[in-house]
Design a protein with these regions (language model features):
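ABC family nucleotide-binding domain
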Residues: 1-152
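C-terminal boundary and immediately downstream tail of ABC-type ATPase nucleotide-binding domains
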Residues: 153-174
């Protein structure tokens, strides 16, 4: 039988709204769960947090509060915060939908790096170029139902359903 609480503790989640604590600095946002949930010391949590901020290109912003950062920067902090918990996989729910178009690539670049490093990820997205680059499998849904479940090559190259064909014709040709 699967121990769900234990499994959940190994799953990182990043949502379309970053949900950073506005009254805490970026460093504090990255360390609080490490200390409270994982029992890491302040120094250990801070070191891990700063290393992850460096990884997402934001180490120079460690002292700032979320309101002092762009949406793309805040979303990269949210990714670093999830990674600080040492997840075995990551769930992303429309991580770029709340961002200005110019900020989207900042976040997608970090996610592409994670995929290239072998992180298992499940991502709800409308970013088809991103999905085409990093996905192994695509599940296409419409009105809450699975319309197509295919490899990325099959989905993008020869979608089986009329609905997926219509969607891709509109999305990939603009």
């Amino acid at each position: 039988k699967t121990n769900l609480p234990k499994l959940r503790s190994h799953v990182g989640m990043v949502f379309q709204h970053f949900e950073l604590f506005p009254h805490l600095t970026i460093t504090e946002n990255l360390t609080i769960a490490q200390e409270k949930v994982l029992g890491r010391s302040k120094d250990e949590a801070r070191d891990k947090g700063l290393k992850l901020l460096d990884r997402v290109g934001l180490k120079a912003h460690a002292h700032k509060h979320p309101a002092q950062m762009s949406g793309g920067q805040q979303q990269r902090v949210a990714i670093a915060r999830a990674l600080a918990m040492d997840p075995i996989c990551m769930l992303f729910d429309e991580p770029t939908s709340a961002l200005d178009p110019e900020m989207i690539n900042e976040v997608l670049d970090v996610m592409v790096e994670l995929a290239q490093e072998g992180m298992t990820m499940m991502c709800v997205t409308h970013e088809m170029g991103f999905a085409k680059t990093v996905a192994h499998r695509v599940i296409f849904m419409d009105h809450g139902l699975i319309v197509e479940d295919a490899t990325k090559d099959d989905f993008f190259g020869k979608p089986r359903s009329d609905r997926a064909q219509q969607f891709l014709a509109k999305i990939l040709h603009h």
